[in-house]
Amino acid sequence: MDATFSVDAWSAFAAGLEEDAAWREWARAPWLPVGDAMPALAEMAPMQRRRVERLGRAALQVAWRCQGDGAGEMPMVFASRHGDLDRTHRMLAELARDEPLSPTQFGLSTHNAIAAQYSIARGLQGNYLAVSAVRATPEAAVTEALGLLADGAPAVLVVVYDDAIPGDYNAFLDEPDALHAWAWRIVPPHGDLPCLSLRAGEPATGGRLPHSLDVLRFFLSGDATLPGADGGGWLRHA
């Protein structure tokens, strides 16, 4: 399987960062986004949007913008290290108080729920996956996308998203956390677009950003390499 690919469209969201120009400037001097900003997600019908919480809104907003209106069906890989942990944490607190759980809230807390809501809202019937691989979640997502390209898909939508975790879990943090979401439309290597690849290498050490956000910084900055979270790494081809 060829581990080289191009990105022909992208979108990203975080507090204080939404426009492409702002993201490119951020990539030159990155900082950890903080704040309670939430995208409008105006593309989604209000009755559907009301069920989507902050993390889901960020993920669906970048997916909608990246896929576009005229792209048609394509396989999708939704990837999040923690998923909608805030919703899960609230349900665990309800269980601890011996309160009944809402079946709707349980369904919306599953790891593929955000992808499912996107698929339903857009009337999509194609293949989608939901993956999680600790700090190596972006690498796992792109690896899945490369497999789909190898199977003949002309393009794959990759959506990576995470949020700050509830305070009760802070003792388990091994990297900074913040709300962020980004999407790439991945295509086979294209001569008119920069080519990226995954490769073997030394694992990344902790930095000032969540690893998944650092991958976006690498993509936007033009850097030649970025260590991966699992012993692999990212390479930009000249």
Model-based region annotation:
Residues 1-105, 109-130, 136, 160-238:
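Conserved "HGTGT" condensation-loop signature of ketosynthase/thiolase-family condensing enzymes
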